Each structure stands twice: as C-alpha cells, then as structure tokens.
C-alpha cells in the first residue's frame, strides 16, 4: 500500500517541480524597474494638493503619501519643445540645438535622430517602450517617436493650440491623432479637444496591461493643462464651472488610472513613476509660493515644477526632498536603475540622482549650480536672475532660504556674490555655445494631415 501511494505521489511531485519556476517568477521582483514618466503641460507649481492647492487631487495626494515630494525640482527649459528635448536626452536643449523655440506643424526642424533618448537606452536593455500623448519634437517621420526608440506611439504630434481653430494669424492643417506613424483621426472642435486626456490615458493603460509581463517604459506627455482649455461638460459641472479645477482633476484621475493599473497587475512594487511638468504655469494656473510663471523673467515659478516620485517599498513613503534635481537627471538615473551605461561619446548634462530618490543617507544633489537657461543661476540658497526691459538690463539676487517668493533683491548688498554667479553663468553659456550639436533638419517637410476628408474625428474614432 505504501509503495502504491509513493508511486501515485510521483506525478504530483513532478507537477510541482514543473510549476515551481512559474510560481517563483510570479513573486519575483527584478532589480530593474519598469518606468513611467507622466509629463504635464503648463501646470503651475501650486496646482496640485501635495504642493498646497485647494484643487481636489486625491490620487496625487495618495501618490505623495506613498512616495516622495521633490520640492526643488527643475525643468531645463521653459517651453514645450526645449523642455521635452532635455527630458528625453538628459541634455540642455541649447546643447542639442533645440533651445531656441518650439517646433510647428510641418517644421523642417526636430530632435536629431542621432541623439540618444531614454527610450533607446531602455529598449537596448530589453524594455518595451511606448509614448502616449503630446510629442512636440518634430512631426516629420525621422523625428517622430518610432524613430526615437519607442515601439508604440499614440497621441498628438504637437501642441493642441496648433489646430485649425487656433491662432488666426497662422494657417494650420487639421490637428491629427496619430497611431504609430499614421493619422487615424483628427481634432476639429471643442468636443474632440475635451477627450484628449482620456484618449491618452486609455492608450497608456492598454500598453501597461499588454506589457505587464516584461520590463517597460511608458512615457505619458499630456497636452493638458495647455490652452485651449477644453474639458467634458460632466467634468466642468463637477468642478462647478472652474475650468482649471476640471483640468487638474482630469490629470489627477488619469494618474490614478495608471497607478491603479500597476496595482491591479501587481507590478506596482517594481515600477518607478515620476510625475512632473514641462515648465511653469500659464494662464489661470497657480505658482503657489513662487514668483513668476511660464512667461517672463527666470523667477522660480518659471522653471521649478511640482514633482512626485513613487516606487512602493523602494522610495520612502511620505518623504520630502529639497535637494536640487532636474529633468536632465532622469535619463542617467533611469539608465542606472536599468543597469545601462549612459552614452560616453557625447556630453550628457544630467546626473544619476537615484540615491536621493531611494532615501539613502547623506545623499546630496550632484549640482553645484542650477541654470535657468541663459538668464539665471542658483548655487545653494543663492539665486541670480537677469533680464531686459527694452534697452535696460536688470540683475537681481535672492536668498531662497529666507525669500522663496523672490521679493527682496540683495544684489546691492552682496556685489561679490553677484559677480561670482554672473561669471559662473557666463562660463556655462560659453561652454554650451562652443559645443552645440545640431538639431535634425529635413528638406521640404510635409504636413502629417493636409486634409481631414475621410478621416474620423477623435470622438468618432473612440466610439467605433
């Protein structure tokens, strides 16, 4: 009887042996995390709950409680195209020829395909890569996401104000909704504008669901809260007619959907999520305690952005860092976490800040200086701003520890500090200008969508 029982148990033992690797894999958390970057457009420093806003942002509030709030995080340029260029390459936009202005529909200029993006680094490490949202780094085929390291793309190729109902002084082609490299819908009216955030979110969530069993990089550059400010009637009603509250609520809900997708697939503890913004706020946004906004002199509200980092059990929950970090640091940080080297054949301006994010003892900012393009510099608590009003030049100095709102100009009291910071800023600008790498250029660029005849609106496309 005992021998028969032993024989009967052998197949069961074999089955357990067969499935043991699968069971082990299901509970195994690899060293290299998935990466999600949520990049908001034109949102102010004070527009979300974790940074003092009265707007209702429950998902971002939870993200901050479960992760880290970065109070001194900066973009490297204060405009759509330059800021995105810096984020994806780890380089100052001026260094790679993308700092002068935004690109327009059918522009001959775009991000040079010879530049190396976060997507290309992670793809080399075996990651699936997807971009969902506003690209705005050139709309010619050699500049688009599929040529810059992304396996998948869905979204709008440039700003949502570059459409037929936009600037009457500029003749725009229809604003296309792209999937891969192909226009599959267009955005002709307010109704179509109002569903863009949901369309971006749905595409990102689908990508995460599809790729949950392998490493992935999901880049989500929203077009909200950039003007024109379009939201669904239902969201506007919930916000009691406050358009900015409705837009911020929309972004909060989108972020919540992405985080919940990670939790539901049980990959949240192996995913780094960064939530940040492309520049200071514009229009009816709030800079909170900061002076300035997207346009104007290089005050803090111009380039300091509300940023959250989330990676359960890795990033200390409820933590706050006031160390200086910037979007140019994301590429080297993510490369290190993925076990990949950063390019050695070119200058990469950013630094690995993973020790700060992971809460390591005594981790400090790698930046001696933070630069505000060509007209501002910060060293520790000291901040120098220079600007022109017509023919007049102005230089101001602030102590950010005592005067975060930059109201008490100390330039006359500390002339030596003004001199030292001015020299450091000029030296930085000189080095950048001496080694500019060219932007990508094409001859005879063509619009992605010259005529919308026969192509559905985005609302129609989503309702198929």
Give a label for each model feature.
Residues 53-57, 68, 74-79, 105-116, ...:
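A short beta-strand-to-alpha-helix junction
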Residues 98-100, 105-108, 112-124, 137-216, ...:
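Formylglycine-dependent
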Residues 37, 45-130, 140, 145-152, ...:
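Active-site segment of extracytoplasmic enzymes that catalyze sulfate/phosphate-ester chemistry
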Residues 28-33, 40, 44-45, 69, ...:
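Long, internal low-complexity/basic segments
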Residues 49-55, 69-91, 99, 131-143, ...:
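Short, solvent-exposed turn/loop segments enriched in Gly/Ser/Thr/Pro and often Arg
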Residues 32-36, 66-71, 125-130, 151, ...:
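Loop/turn elements at helix/coil->beta-strand transitions in domains of secreted/extracellular proteins
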Residues 141-149, 228-231, 239-247, 260-314, ...:
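Histidine-centered active-site microenvironments of extracellular/periplasmic hydrolases
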Residues 147, 151-152, 157-161, 281-300, ...:
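C-terminal cap/loop subdomain of S1 sulfatases and analogous C-terminal strand-loop tails that border
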């Amino acid at each position: 009887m005992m021998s028969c029982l032993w024989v009967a148990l052998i197949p069961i033992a074999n089955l357990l042996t067969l499935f043991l690797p699968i069971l082990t894999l299901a509970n195994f958390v690899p060293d290299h995390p998935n990466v999600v970057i949520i990049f908001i457009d034109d949102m102010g420093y004070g527009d979300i709950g974790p940074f003092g806003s009265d707007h209702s942002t429950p998902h971002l509030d939870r993200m901050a409680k479960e992760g880290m709030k970065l109070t001194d995080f900066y973009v490297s340029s204060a405009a759509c195209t330059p800021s995105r260029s810096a984020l994806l390459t780890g380089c100052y936009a001026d260094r790679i020829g993308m700092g002068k202005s935004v690109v327009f529909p059918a522009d001959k200029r775009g991000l040079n395909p010879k530049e190396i993006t976060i997507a290309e680094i992670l793809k080399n490490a075996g990651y699936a890569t997807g971009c969902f949202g506003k690209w705005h780094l050139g709309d010619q085929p050699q500049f688009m996401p599929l040529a810059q390291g992304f396996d998948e793309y869905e979204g709008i190729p440039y700003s949502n104000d570059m459409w037929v109902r936009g600037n009457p002084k500029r003749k725009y082609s229809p604003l296309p909704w792209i999937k891969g490299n192909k226009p599959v819908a267009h955005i002709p009216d307010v109704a179509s504008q109002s569903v863009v955030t949901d369309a971006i979110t749905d595409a990102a969530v689908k990508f995460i669901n599809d790729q949950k069993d392998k490493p992935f990089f999901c880049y989500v550059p929203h077009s909200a809260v950039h003007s024109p400010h379009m939201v669904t009637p239902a969201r506007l009603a919930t916000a009691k007619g406050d358009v900015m509250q409705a837009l911020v609520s929309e972004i909060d809900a989108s972020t919540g959907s992405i985080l919940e997708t990670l939790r539901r697939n049980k990959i949240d503890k192996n995913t780094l999520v960064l939530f940040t913004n492309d520049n200071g706020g514009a229009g009816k946004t709030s800079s909170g305690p900061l002076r300035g906004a997207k346009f104007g002199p290089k005050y803090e509200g111009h380039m300091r952005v509300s940023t959250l980092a989330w990676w359960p059990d890795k990033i200390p929950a409820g933590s706050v860092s006031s160390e200086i970090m910037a979007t140019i640091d994301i590429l080297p940080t993510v490369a290190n976490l993925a076990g990949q080297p950063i390019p050695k054949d070119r200058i990469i301006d950013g630094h690995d800040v993973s020790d700060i994010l992971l809460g390591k003892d005594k981790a400090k900012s790698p930046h001696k200086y933070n630069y505000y393009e060509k007209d501002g510099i910060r060293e520790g608590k000291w901040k120098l701003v220079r600007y022109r009003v017509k023919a007049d030049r102005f230089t101001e100095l602030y102590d950010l520890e005592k005067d975060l709102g930059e109201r008490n100009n100390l330039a006359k009291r500390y002339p030596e500090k003004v001199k030292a910071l001015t020299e450091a800023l000029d030296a930085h600008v000189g080095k950048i200008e001496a080694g500019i790498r060219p932007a990508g250029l094409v001859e005879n660029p063509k619009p992605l969508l010259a005529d919308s005849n026969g192509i559905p609106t985005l609302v129609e496309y989503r309702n198929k």
